[in-house]
């Protein structure tokens, strides 16, 4: 009997009337492989890529585009074959007929799996072989390409079984198509939806939650908790040649789906056909899995809508409403009777208790999320958003063994390889200031108009802890100017904070593209464009000054900013290939603050003849701007006397940027006009405003606490408050 089930004659017998399935799949794989390959290769030839580039692109084709096109048809095949093989379980007549045959259910199960596999595998292999032959005819053939084709077959076969058995499992535990469709949608979407809901709730109740950089369970649920998202993540890794770990996860998950669906099939009661759910205990579990998040989500929506202190009351109302509605709708579906909406009140009460517990975990922070900081000995390194902390927008540049460079922009700070660390983890003083920042978060709950009790300017700093165990923890802290300075000081003193800039400047000056600097007056100058020896001299001077600078030197007020760009050789990447370009290159960009202690740099820059600092700029007139409580310009005054202008220049900060470790006056600024008629905007340093300005304004500290967002609210969030003076 076993041999008969696997014989070609038996397959032809059971496939009568079903030939449209392999025919349809043959058409799909014809489009996914030969047609897609011909279209893409034709476009490459028209773009005039070099032969080496064409071979690189062709290898990438088998690791990227054909993975997607073939994968899409593979998923369609899994859906069609699973429906063809197991949808009969929803029909009482078909169940009675098939289960009356003298064939064991286990044999029947594997027969349907085997038949579906043939429907999928035969057209797949034919069309993939056809695509390989087309590539060989166009000059693309090697053992490596054959290996890529074989690996692609195995990858798609794994994806086929994953989706096939996940759908079969749904057929085996549900009794009608409506519930089957709902359960299948839930299987594919539940994990990501739950992850998003948990992230929203964490953002709403945990002030240190970093919503832009999910990690841990939040990232796991969003990216890996459903067959669809897990497959998408695997495709990305596979393209980069890093998919082995996720392939193992997919394989294990496929085995689980196979075993559970097999168990559910052979134990499925025949009389379950037509019923919404086959197994009562599973139905109860699914109900709780749906009702609890619905209650939480509805409560959170009602928590966000009001702006008054009654938001907690509305949150409770929303939780009750969401729990009752979700429970009632699911129960009505289970019993196929709307009168069952309020049935099973004990389960409704249990769900309400679970919703309450979850709400308390968030609202009361029972897990101490905001107060948590890893132990010092557990921390291996720190990831810091340096653009917020120090205004550093220098790219991450690292030279590879083959002489090429890897280049990532400053927004890549959260990657593990871009972390800062000392000789052995982080230093004691760095950890102490981090503890201080964490302890102060309780008084800085600014997201939902919490009570602000501190004065000063605040920024939101994104930070990541890399632990020795391999885990990572992401946080978003609100820090003031003093804490910015202390943290930077200790990072310079105990960690390798200088390394990023030093690695950037270590690039050979032969790759140098441009050097410019922005003076303290806000004007930019391209320098030494025709003197490469002076450019090299300047870079060496900056490198020397950075190495010799003490931490306190790097926390002074910068007098200018140096901009440097390199054009560096990089590894060939199919996504950035330029037709005909044999040696790919990429621009690396850096902005480096220049401090008064940089004597060597200053000496070289003086050769340009340009004014370096604000003090060296000839000022003709100054217009002082005063702002009201809303931050709108209220009054203005002009000054032209030399003594007054000198005093204003001494009190003004450079106009090329603001610095997190420097405190500024919140309600007054200036527009300076040079002798040449050029204007530059400047802020005033805290406590440095001349007396005649104070007399003119009456008070420079007249604005209430206000939240000001700059760019991304999660990366640079400013808050100016004078609460302590009240």
Residue ranges and their predicted role:
Residues 290-291, 333-369:
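Internal/C-terminal transmembrane anchor helices
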Residues 719-726:
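Conserved small/polar residues in nucleotide/adenosyl-binding loops
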Residues 1-90, 261-269, 300-310, 330-346, ...:
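Hydrophobic alpha-helical transmembrane segments
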Residues 85-118, 273-274, 531-550, 638-642, ...:
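Helix-loop-helix units of permease transmembrane domains in multi-pass membrane transporters
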Residues 442-481, 550-585, 658-684:
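Short, structured surface segments that line ligand/substrate-binding pockets
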Residues 39-61, 192-281, 294-316, 329, ...:
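Terminal transmembrane helical anchor/hairpin motif
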Residues 362-453:
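Membrane-interface segments at or immediately adjacent to transmembrane helices
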Residues 60, 67, 114-175, 179, ...:
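Secretory targeting signals
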């Amino acid at each position: 009997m076993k041999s008969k089930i696997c014989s070609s004659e038996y397959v032809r017998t059971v496939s009568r009337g079903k030939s449209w399935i392999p025919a349809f799949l043959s058409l799909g794989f014809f489009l996914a492989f030969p047609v897609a390959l011909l279209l893409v290769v034709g476009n490459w030839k028209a773009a005039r890529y070099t032969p080496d580039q064409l071979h690189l692109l062709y290898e990438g084709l088998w690791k990227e585009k054909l993975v997607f096109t073939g994968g899409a048809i593979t998923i369609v095949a899994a859906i069609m074959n699973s429906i063809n093989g197991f949808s009969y379980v929803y029909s009482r007549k078909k169940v009675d007929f098939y289960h009356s045959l003298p064939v064991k259910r286990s044999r029947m199960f594997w027969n349907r799996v085997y038949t579906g596999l043939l429907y999928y595998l035969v057209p797949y292999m034919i069309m993939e072989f056809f695509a390989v032959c087309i590539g060989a005819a166009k000059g693309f053939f090697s053992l490596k390409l054959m290996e890529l084709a074989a690996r692609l077959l195995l990858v798609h076969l794994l994806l086929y079984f994953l989706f096939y058995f996940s759908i079969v499992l749904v057929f085996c535990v549900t009794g009608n198509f409506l519930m089957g469709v709902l359960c299948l949608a839930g299987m594919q979407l539940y994990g990501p939806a739950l992850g998003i809901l948990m992230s929203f709730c964490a953002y709403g109740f945990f002030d240190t939650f970093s919503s832009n950089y999910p990690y841990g369970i939040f990232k796991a649920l969003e990216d890996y908790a459903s067959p669809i998202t897990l497959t998408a993540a695997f495709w990305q890794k596979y393209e980069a040649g890093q998919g082995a770990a996720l392939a193992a996860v997919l394989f294990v998950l496929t085995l689980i789906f196979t075993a559970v669906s097999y168990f559910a099939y052979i134990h499925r009661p025949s009389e379950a056909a037509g019923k919404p759910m086959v197994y009562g205990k599973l139905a109860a579990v699914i109900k709780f899995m749906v009702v609890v998040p619905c209650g939480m989500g509805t409560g959170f929506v009602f928590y966000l809508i009001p702006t008054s202190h009654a938001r907690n009351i509305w949150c409770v109302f929303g939780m009750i409403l969401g729990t009752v509605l979700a429970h009632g709708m699911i129960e009505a579906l289970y019993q196929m009777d709307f009168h069952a909406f309020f049935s099973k009140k004990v389960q409704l009460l249990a769900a309400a208790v679970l919703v309450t517990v979850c709400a308390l975990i968030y609202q009361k922070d029972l897990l101490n999320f905001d107060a948590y900081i890893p132990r010092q000995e557990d921390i291996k390194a720190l990831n810091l958003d340096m653009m917020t902390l120090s205004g550093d927008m220098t790219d991450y540049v690292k030279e590879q063994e083959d002489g090429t460079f890897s280049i990532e922009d400053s927004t890549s700070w959260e990657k593990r390889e871009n972390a800062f660390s000392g000789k052995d983890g982080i230093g004691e003083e760095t950890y102490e200031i981090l503890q201080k920042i964490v302890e102060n978060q309780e008084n800085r709950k600014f997201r939902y108009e919490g009570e602000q009790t501190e004065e000063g300017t605040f920024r939101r700093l994104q930070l990541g802890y890399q632990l020795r165990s391999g885990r990572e923890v992401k946080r978003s802290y609100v820090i003031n100017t003093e804490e910015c300075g202390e943290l930077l000081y200790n990072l310079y003193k105990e960690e390798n904070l200088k390394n990023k800039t030093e690695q950037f400047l270590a690039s050979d000056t032969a790759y140098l593209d441009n050097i410019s600097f922005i003076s303290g007056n806000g004007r930019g100058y391209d320098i030494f464009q025709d003197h490469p020896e002076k450019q090299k001299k300047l870079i060496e001077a900056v490198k020397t000054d950075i190495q010799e600078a003490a931490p306190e030197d790097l926390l002074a007020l910068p007098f200018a900013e140096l901009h440097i760009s390199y054009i560096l050789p990089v590894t060939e990447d199919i996504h950035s290939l330029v037709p005909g370009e044999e040696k790919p290159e990429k621009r690396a960009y850096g902005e480096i603050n220049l401090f008064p202690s940089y004597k060597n740099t200053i000496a070289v820059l003086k050769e340009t003849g340009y004014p370096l600092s604000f003090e060296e700029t000839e000022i003709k007139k100054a217009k002082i701007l005063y702002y009201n409580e809303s931050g709108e310009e209220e009054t203005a005054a002009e000054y032209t006397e030399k003594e007054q202008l000198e005093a204003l220049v001494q009190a003004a900060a450079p106009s090329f940027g603001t610095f997190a470790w420097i405190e500024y006056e919140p309600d007054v600024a200036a527009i300076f006009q040079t002798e040449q008629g050029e204007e530059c905007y400047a802020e005033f340093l805290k406590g440095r405003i001349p007396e005649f300005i104070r007399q003119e304004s009456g008070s420079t500290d007249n604005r209430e606490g206000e939240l000001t967002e700059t760019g991304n609210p999660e990366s640079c969030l400013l808050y100016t408050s004078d609460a302590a003076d009240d």
